[in-house]
């Protein structure tokens, strides 16, 4: 019987996607993310709210490697990646890293047990790719393969981004998705009526994952995925730019975003932990944007900025 090696790492929530990416780059065949924040106010499949759980700033990420892989080499590679993240001032918290062997049938079933369909917004529901799910009238389905990494799409930062897209998209827009990761925001943009979506990520793994997830969904031929370093070198104008990435990186997006966004267009920024909110907000204001909406879930923030000369309807306008 073929065995798998299960490696579990506990890190600060802010580093969730960056560390997930490290695990995939080290050869993981799937990643499962357990975050207590995902259950706040969420209903289970029977319509009942999940019981109250103790909240923590830490999340647990579980990765799976073939039995033939050298787990000591993998741990060394991951530790080197974690050290690089520390040098970039990414908050990792008190790290723990453990591993164990797992039988084939346990691997096949265990990681899928983490994931169920989740209604995220009024219109959008995220459904694991293997689930037979029948949509209700008006419900828009985003199919994802969580085993490809980047979680399930139910993290608060993703939820806030989806709420923001639902708020600003009216149909016919051009959208740029910065740091696309799983591709969930690009898929949502298309489902919400965007005419064209351009998705970029610096990481080759993310580009592949996004393309694979987009292929799981209907009517997504209007999504174009490519490798790219934030918005550097782009000339394509957009009505909406959405970026759900680390706050320390968001501050480097605002100037290029202002250059590319059309008049009366929107910049959506998520992934902002509360202690770094003012830093990100000021970077966007300095670039020329006006703040229209501030959304908060737990310690996570999302901001909707508008490129406009009309001060009515904006915060402080």
Swiss-Prot record:
| Broad class of the protein's primary localization | cytoplasm
> Per the UniProt record, which EC number(s) apply here?
2.1.1.-
Any idea which UniProt keywords this protein has?
A: Cytoplasm, Methyltransferase, S-adenosyl-L-methionine, Transferase
Q: Where in or outside the cell is it found?
A: Cytoplasm
What positions does the entry give for S-adenosyl-L-methionine binding? 158, 179, 201, 244
- The set of disulfide-linked cysteines is none
| GO term, biological process aspect, one | methylation
What is this enzyme's catalytic activity, as reactions? L-lysyl-[protein] + 3 S-adenosyl-L-methionine = N(6),N(6),N(6)-trimethyl-L-lysyl-[protein] + 3 S-adenosyl-L-homocysteine + 3 H(+)
Of the GO CC terms on this record, one is: cytoplasm
Recorded GO molecular functions are: protein-lysine N-methyltransferase activity
What function does the entry list? Methylates ribosomal protein L11.
Q: Tell me the protein family, please.
A: Belongs to the methyltransferase superfamily. PrmA family.
Q: What is this protein called?
A: Ribosomal protein L11 methyltransferase
């Amino acid at each position: 019987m073929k065995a798998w090696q299960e490696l579990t790492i506990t890190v600060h929530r802010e580093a969730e996607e960056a560390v997930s990416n490290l695990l995939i780059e080290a050869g993981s065949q799937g990643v499962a993310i357990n975050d207590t924040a995902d259950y706040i106010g969420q209903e289970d499949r029977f319509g009942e709210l999940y019981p109250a759980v103790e909240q923590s700033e830490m999340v647990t990420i579980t990765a799976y490697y073939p039995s033939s892989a050298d787990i000591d080499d993998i741990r060394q590679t991951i530790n080197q990646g974690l050290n690089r993240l520390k040098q970039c001032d990414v908050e990792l918290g008190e790290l723990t890293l453990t591993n164990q062997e797992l039988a084939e049938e346990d691997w096949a079933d265990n990681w899928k047990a983490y994931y169920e369909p989740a209604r995220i917004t009024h219109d959008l529901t995220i459904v694991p790719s293997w689930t037979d799910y029948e949509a209700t009238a008006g419900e828009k389905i985003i199919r994802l393969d969580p085993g490809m990494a980047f979680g399930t799409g139910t993290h608060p930062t993703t939820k806030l981004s989806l709420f923001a897209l639902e708020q600003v998209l009216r149909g016919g827009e051009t959208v740029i998705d910065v740091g696309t990761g799983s591709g969930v925001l690009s898929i949502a943009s298309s489902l919400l009526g965007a005419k064209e979506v351009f998705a970029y990520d610096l990481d080759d793994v993310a580009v592949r994952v996004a393309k694979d997830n987009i292929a799981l969904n209907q009517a997504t031929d209007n999504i174009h995925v490519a490798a790219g370093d934030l918005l550097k070198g782009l000339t394509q104008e957009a009505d909406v730019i959405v970026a759900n990435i680390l706050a320390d990186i968001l501050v480097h997006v605002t100037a290029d975003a202002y250059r590319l966004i059309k008049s009366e267009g929107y910049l959506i920024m998520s992934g902002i932990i509360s202690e770094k909110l003012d830093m990100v907000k000021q970077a966007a204001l300095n670039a020329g944007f006006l703040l229209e909406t501030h959304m908060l879930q737990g310690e996570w923030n999302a901001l909707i900025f508008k490129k406009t000369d009309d001060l009515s309807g904006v915060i402080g306008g």
